[in-house]
């Protein structure tokens, strides 16, 4: 089969009742003949009714139930309409054909399935390339025209289950047939002329040959829908009747004239009246109009020329209600509530069922139909009256709002009227509810009658009495009558035929039902006996299981009691061990304190010895200073005796030397005082319990040794403990870290994670504080050392002039030595402090 012989199919689609357009699809008969035949027969409806569902195998009236943007649109479920139904012409489902064609371009038609070899009637049209569907879904066609209709459906709004909010219905579908064009007389003339030209023996060129080929090809093709003037054997007649077509208007081409709906005479009359009116240009009239148009509902003026915005005022309550915009009101009037729609549908269906079941009782039917029609007309009249009243009231309120402010009396009147109106509506609704309840009872009785026969139940299923609740938006209440689908009409016609056949078969069915009832009773009694025997057996098994469970529970309780007694004895032994440990700790602490006291006494003795040695060194330094002064005096006398002409210069130099020596004496005295103060501070610290740095260092080293010894003891004791615990409880293993972790807690209660975390954070804070204190001390010491070095440098500069004697040099060297000794002592103290801080951080 060539590509020219491929068949074409069309689908006329409506969106929310409006015709969207036609989708034309070309089928790949040569690649997937079985799937193409299934799709073609479902489009034409020539396959009859389904074997499983019992419904007509036809896409007409079905919907596109699934729409995914930038992916595909899916339809073809003519049985349920929600994607869970559908049936092929082969009965149920059929196997996949070869996956030759791929989903490598948009607008490809492919079969939907639930898995391999589960093709039914559902199909989908891709809107983008979808290579992930290759070798899963069978491609059997492509969209030739109507791509814009597919994109329009694709961009519809959907709910959470990808179902479009607007109803997308296949209004009509079928096959397109090719036909040859009629040959015109001009072509026949050309053929005659060509024959004469051959007689004259003119040679044909390539161009003429090509032209003839093109003519032959153009003769083939023109597409026709089924239902146009073609041979009856090839085509199927259309279902459109002449009665259904609307009447032609009087002026067919009147829509081409761009005129308004109002007649010309009335418009001319209005214009003339406006021209003739005396107050047309009066200022008073203009002001009145402006005031009338530009006031809020509370009476305030609206300034400005812009469009009015509808909003609730700030001071008003929700009960008061703002002015609803006119376009909102129009839309609200168009919408009908679900309850009203269900009521009307139920009445219609009840009426149709009564007609089908009781065709003889014409008088009763007429009376019932009259009642139903009257009730529906009353409801519609009530709705229209309510709409008219609401519009009039709104206009009247608007006029009163524009002219005057609302007084409290006016507000009370308004609320009283609204309450009365609501009461009237509630009374009307209650009457409608009573009527609907009666209708429901009647329908329930009818259902019971129908369920007597199996075929009547099938007819009920076909009519779909229990339809899903869907919100429907109609242009007016009258459109509800004309909103029946063609599918429902077809179902009704079939139901009429079935009713005629049922009257003939009722006698046979009654006999069959009697036999079936007897058999059913026997089977039910047998099933009851079997059920009772099974229940007794299950009851006995259940009792046995309960007894076994109780025995097992008793055994478990006894074991738990034995374990508890053993654990109590172990706790007592553990508490004894804990007491022994605490006693040992207290003893070790007392021994350590005695050692510390002895070391502190030794340190005090050392300090006293150092103080005595310091005092001796001070006395020696004073003696040396006196000797130096004597030497200076003798030198000055010799200089006076030797040099008689320069007495004034020598006297000036002597004075300078004396001043420098006095300064040195003062500095040495201040140093001696500082040393005494330091000694006093050390003695105070010892009395108050504080210790100097050297003593602290010695104590730390000793404490480290003790710790190492105690750690060794702890390790031994912990290893012994762990062995004993392993013997008791193999599951619980206590390491050294685990014991140290719970040191401060009693054995009866172990700490929680939160408590451990708090303890860790507290230690961290203490460590940081100690480090901060140490760093502050170090900073202050470094500053004091800098100051001392600066002072010494200044003094050395003052003593450095060349005219100074050897005595000054010796004094400066002494001062340098003292400064260096002090600096070295400070460095050693700082290094000791840094070591101590490191040891703390490591601890």
Curated annotation (Swiss-Prot):
Cite the record's Low complexity compositional bias ranges: 186-198, 801-843
UniProt biased composition (Polar residues): 614-642
* Ranges of compositional bias, category Basic residues: 201-214, 268-282, 289-308, 578-588, 702-739
What reaction does this enzyme carry out catalytically? [protein]-peptidylproline (omega=180) = [protein]-peptidylproline (omega=0)
Amino acid composition bias (Basic and acidic residues), ranges on this chain:
241-253, 316-330, 378-397, 406-453, 497-577, 589-613, 655-701, 753-777
User: Gene3D superfamilies from the entry?
Assistant: Cyclophilin-like (2.40.100.10)
Span list, region Disordered: 178-330, 378-453, 495-843
Family annotation (Pfam families): Pro_isomerase
Free-text activity regulation comment from the record: Relatively insensitive to inhibition by cyclosporin A (CsA).
Q: Which GO terms describe its biological process?
A: protein folding
Q: Which UniProt keywords apply?
A: Isomerase, Rotamase
- Can you name this protein? Peptidyl-prolyl cis-trans isomerase 1
Query: Which organism is this protein's natural source?
Result: Brugia malayi (Filarial nematode worm)
This protein's encoding gene: CYP-1
